[in-house]
Regions:
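NAD(P)+-binding Rossmann beta1-loop-alpha1 motif at the extreme N-terminus of oxidoreductases
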Residues: 1-65, 91, 96-97, 127
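Rossmann-fold dinucleotide-binding core
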Residues: 4, 67, 93, 98-178
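Methionine-biased hydrophobic packing positions in alpha-helices, especially
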Residues: 12, 16, 66, 87, ...
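Hydrophobic residues within alpha-helices
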Residues: 16-20, 107, 152, 193
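Hydrophobic beta-strand scaffold residues
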Residues: 28, 49, 117-119, 160, ...
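Rossmann-fold NAD(P) dinucleotide-binding segment
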Residues: 53-116
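Helical "substrate-binding/catalytic lid" subdomain
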Residues: 167-289
Length: 289
């Protein structure tokens, strides 16, 4: 059993922290910007509530965070009352935020200078994956810290991979989002085409999902897409944040991402339709408007 802090109890962090407490059996202290959410978590799962990230992190073996973006991450780590000020030497900070590789490298350097380790460890699997404890975790950082943290991360994961040095976890998550963007647009166009052709979409998917076109998105989203229901997953506002990170990194490393850039604009169109909180499969709604 380890002593653990978790910073950020959103739709992902709330169940992830719960798995660390209930499945992992760890002592968990939580911090959330909206205190009422942390109070609810403690009432539901036990553990302790801390008023600041610094208070949460003090003396802990492992500190996790799952927050909104680079600025939020800097705030809970190196900002006023940030966790880095109180972390003990030899501890490991594991960040599950989808953020830039740049901020991951920056925080890795600051952690090393202070005598503890930093792992960038974004996740894939959405809210359902977090609730069921079956997330995929893509990790960047030192192997020693990874092996130390892996048994703890395992409480909410089904796949944990060390992808390389600091920033590599975030870069891998970018590839994940780039791939998903193209897959969903292709699926949306396929369903749209099938409807226009007068085909039974259920029968079509039953057949093509067993061939080369099959994907997680097809298996898990075609029914809701066909029914015009878009409240079953990752919100478009967050997907556009992620794709913005991908496109910024591509500008830095010289990668050409024409489809990703186009799909990002398609998501912008869906936002303008009032779909900011619709899930990513709502690309079909744009085609059917």
């Amino acid at each position: 059993m380890a002593s653990v802090a978790f910073l950020g109890l959103g739709v992902m962090g709330y169940p992830m922290a719960a798995h660390l407490k209930n499945k992992g059996g760890h002592e968990v202290t939580v911090y959330n910007r909206t205190r009422a959410t942390a109070e609810k978590w403690v009432a539901q799962h036990g553990g302790k509530l801390a008023p600041t990230p610094a208070d949460a992190a003090a003396g802990q073996d492992f500190v996790f965070s799952c927050v909104g973006n680079d600025d939020d991450l800097r705030s809970v780590t190196t900002g006023p009352q940030g966790a880095f000020a109180t972390m003990k030497k030899g501890a490991v900070y594991i960040d599950n935020t989808t953020a830039s590789a740049e901020v991951a490298r920056e925080l890795d350097e600051k952690a090393k200078a202070a005598g503890f380790s930093f792992l960038d460890a974004p996740v894939s699997g959405g809210q359902a994956g977090a609730e069921n404890g079956v997330l995929t975790v893509m990790v960047g950082g030192e192997e020693e810290a990874f092996e130390k943290a892996r048994p703890v991360i395992d409480a909410f994961a089904r796949m944990i991979g060390l992808m390389g040095p600091a920033g590599s976890g975030q870069l891998t998550k970018m590839i994940n989002q780039i791939t998903i963007a193209g897959l969903i647009q292709g699926l949306a166009e396929g369903i749209h085409f099938g409807k226009k052709a007068g085909l039974d979409i259920e029968k079509v998917v039953e057949v093509i999902s067993k061939g080369a076109a099959g994907s997680w998105q097809m298996e898990n989203r075609h029914k809701t897409m066909n029914a015009g229901k878009y409240d079953y997953g990752f919100a478009i506002d967050w997907m556009r944040k992620d794709l913005g990170i991908c496109l910024d990194e591509a500008n830095r490393n010289g990668a050409s991402l024409p489809v990703t850039a186009l799909v990002d604009q398609f998501y912008k169109d869906v936002q303008a339709m009032g779909g900011r909180r619709w899930d990513t499969s709502a690309l079909l709604a744009r085609l059917e408007r």
